[in-house]
Every structure is written in C-alpha cells, then in structure tokens.
Swiss-Prot record:
Its main location: nucleus. The gene is H2AJ. The nucleosome is a histone octamer containing two molecules each of H2A, H2B, H3 and H4 assembled in one H3-H4 heterotetramer and two H2A-H2B heterodimers. The octamer wraps approximately 147 bp of DNA. Core component of nucleosome. Nucleosomes wrap and compact DNA into chromatin, limiting DNA accessibility to the cellular machineries which require DNA as a template. Histones thereby play a central role in transcription regulation, DNA repair, DNA replication and chromosomal stability. DNA accessibility is regulated via a complex set of post-translational modifications of histones, also called histone code, and nucleosome remodeling. GO terms for cellular component: nucleosome; nucleus. Residues 7-19 have a biased composition (Basic residues). The modification N6-acetyllysine is found at K6, K10. It is found in: Nucleus; Chromosome. Belongs to the histone H2A family. This is Histone H2A.J. The lineage of its organism: Eukaryota, Metazoa, Chordata, Craniata, Vertebrata. Pfam families: Histone, Histone_H2A_C. The modification Phosphothreonine is found at T121.
Length: 129
C-alpha cells in the first residue's frame, strides 16, 4: 500500500455562491453565463460579472425604492407600472438613462402648459392676499 486513498482526506467546504461572496442578491453565475453566450467578447474576466450584477442590483433597488414612494403617495401598497413610470420620469438621472424606454401601462406625467391655465385677474389677486 502506498498510503493513498480515502484515509486522512480533506473535508470539502460547503459550496458558496459567487453572489453570496460578493454580498449580492443578483446571480453572478447567471450574468457570467449570459456574458459568455452573448458573444460580447471572446473572453470574460472573473470580475466583470460581479461588477455588472452589482450595477444591475443597484439600479433595480433605486427604481423600486422610488416606485414604492410613488405607490405610498397614491395610498397603494402594491407597485404597478404607473408607479414605475412616475418614479423614472420624475428622477432626472433615471429619466436620462431610460429616456427612450416605453413602459407598458405606464401612462404619462401630468403636465399642463402655463399658457393654458386661466389667467389671474386683479380681483383674484386681491382675494388671495
């Protein structure tokens, strides 16, 4: 016997996902697979899917937080596409990022041009004071 075999072998540690190692909720492994299958580049580095998953998770959290605020402002407990639309269009940076995106069932932002509003007369100005 050469002493090789199953005796004294190392105990294998429990598998830990790359998402949990990075402290993310989004799937790093899936993002890596999609980057490889998408023919974006011949090779994909180990850090690229972690970074991309982190960016996607941050953007999602930001949009959901603003949409949740919009839902609460409308006295609703469920986020609907209208709340997503209001959240994105009222935020300057998100609106710039998603400017060309159409959200189904999102509606439009309420907006009335100033020239179309009724003009204030002298009697109305006196009443308001």
């Amino acid at each position: 016997m050469s002493g090789r075999g199953k005796q004294g072998g190392k105990v294998r540690a429990k598998a830990k996902s790359r998402s949990s190692r990075a402290g993310l909720q989004f799937p790093v492994g899936r993002v890596h697979r999609l980057l490889r299958k998408g023919n974006y580049a011949e090779r994909v580095g180990a850090g690229a899917p972690v970074y991309l998953a982190a960016v996607l998770e941050y953007l999602t959290a930001e949009i959901l937080e603003l949409a949740g605020n919009a839902a609460r402002d409308n006295k609703k407990t469920r986020i609907i596409p209208r709340h997503l639309q209001l959240a994105i269009r009222n935020d300057e940076e998100l609106n710039k990022l998603l400017g060309k995106v159409t959200i189904a069932q999102g509606g439009v932002l309420p907006n009335i041009q100033a020239v179309l509003l009724p003009k204030k007369t002298e009697s109305q100005k006196a009443k308001s004071k």
